[in-house]
């Protein structure tokens, strides 16, 4: 009997451990902030720096997300951990204009994740906090007054090159909140993933106000390059062009960059091209440069011309008659 006793004890203890259940509930309290910053006088060539300043923000938070997982009440001890979250966007659109935001300083936060749309910043500030029995998960909509001692972050804003002179207020929507996890065991760790947090309502607004004193403007928002009616035998290498003017109030460099909207039928090496259908491509040039990009310099305020050209290309084994159509997008990029 003695030689079986250790095995019997081991199996009994193992069975008891398997029967234990680990419980966790997660809650997220979000703040409804509405922050105003003093208006800044800028030019579109400036990289504008501003702070998502929480000092003047709300202290009342609303429970906006819960994952109780059946763990809503306990009669024994439970343990809590807390994270502060600040999620800020990478771009803001308003009245047809886009500004692009870059994280310049994260302050006391760590950058937990980022995607094409947002920076997800967090700071853990309490772990394994023991609590007596009670409710461990609450109902959506519950309000609490929560302290915030984590500060904010600093962002750089890049303005659209064609933003007209005038006064603008861009609403920067962001998410600020406190995540609380409750466990019926010590040592639990869990952060809400960014893919889930991205779906939360961004109830914070920072009103980014600027007075634009100088920028650059094209004379047209679109160009149509028409090759006219051509014989299939004479269309190859046919060239057509259109010119627009670009006016700048301030000295600057502008990089003009083409993006194809219709895929070409052929490979053209370093030359930029778009597909026109029926076995035809258009090789596009900007001021005579056909690589898809060029830079123009304004040493003083003034107007310069930009000529966009199209040269038809097709191989005899593939070309067909028909209506040819293609398009590209021309970006104006400041340094």
UniProtKB/Swiss-Prot annotation:
Q: Which residue ranges traverse the bilayer?
A: none
**Family annotation (InterPro entries):** Adhesion_dom_fimbrial_sf (IPR036937), Adhesion_dom_sf (IPR008966), PapG_carb-bd_N (IPR005310), PapG_carbohydrate-bd_sf (IPR038420), PapG_chaper-bd_C (IPR005309)
Q: Which family does it belong to?
A: Belongs to the adhesin PapG family.
Some GO term, biological process aspect, for this entry: which one?
cell adhesion
* UniProt GO MF annotations: carbohydrate binding
**Top-down, what is the taxonomic lineage of the species of origin?**
Bacteria, Pseudomonadati, Pseudomonadota, Gammaproteobacteria, Enterobacterales
Q: Name one Pfam family in it.
A: PapG_N
* Originating species: Escherichia coli
The UniProt function text for this chain reads: Tip adhesin component of type P pili that binds preferentially to Gal-alpha(1-4)-Gal-containing glycolipids such as globoside. This tip is common in E.coli strains that cause human cystitis, but rare in pyelonephritic isolates.
Keywords, sorted A to Z: Cell adhesion, Fimbrium, Secreted, Signal
List the protein's name: Fimbrial adhesin PapGIII
The cellular location(s) given in this protein's UniProt record come to: Secreted; Fimbrium
Which residues constitute the signal peptide according to the record? 1-21
Annotated Gene Ontology cellular component terms? extracellular region; pilus
């Amino acid at each position: 009997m003695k030689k079986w006793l250790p095995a019997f004890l081991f199996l009994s203890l193992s069975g008891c451990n398997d029967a234990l259940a680990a419980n966790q509930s997660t809650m997220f309290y979000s703040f409804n902030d509405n922050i105003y910053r003093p208006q800044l006088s800028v030019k579109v060539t400036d990289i504008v720096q501003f702070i998502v300043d929480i000092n003047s923000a709300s202290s009342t938070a609303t429970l906006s997300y819960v994952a109780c997982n059946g763990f809503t009440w306990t009669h024994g001890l439970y343990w809590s951990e807390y994270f502060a979250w600040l999620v800020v966007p990478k771009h803001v659109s308003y009245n047809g204009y886009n500004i692009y935001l870059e994280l310049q300083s994260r302050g006391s936060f760590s950058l937990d994740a980022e995607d094409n749309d947002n920076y997800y910043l967090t700071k853990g500030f309490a772990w394994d906090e023991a609590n007596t029995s009670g409710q461990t998960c609450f109902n959506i909509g519950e309000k609490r007054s929560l302290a915030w001692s984590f500060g904010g972050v600093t962002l750089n804003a890049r303005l659209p090159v064609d933003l007209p002179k005038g006064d603008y207020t861009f609403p920067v929507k962001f998410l600020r909140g406190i995540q609380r996890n409750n466990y019926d065991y010590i040592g639990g760790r869990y952060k809400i993933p960014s893919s889930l947090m991205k779906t939360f309502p961004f109830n914070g607004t920072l009103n980014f106000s600027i007075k634009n004193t100088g920028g650059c403007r094209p004379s047209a928002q679109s160009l149509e390059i028409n090759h006219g009616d051509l014989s299939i035998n004479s269309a190859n290498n046919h060239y057509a062009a259109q010119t627009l003017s670009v006016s700048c109030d301030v000295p600057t460099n502008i990089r003009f960059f083409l993006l194809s909207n219709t895929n070409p039928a052929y490979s053209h090496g370093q030359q930029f091209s778009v597909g026109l259908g029926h076995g035809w491509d258009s090789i596009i040039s900007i001021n005579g440069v056909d690589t898809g990009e060029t830079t123009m310099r304004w040493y003083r305020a003034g107007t310069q011309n930009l000529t966009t050209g199209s040269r038809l290309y097709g191989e005899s084994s593939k070309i067909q008659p028909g209506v040819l159509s293609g398009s590209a997008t021309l970006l104006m990029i400041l340094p």
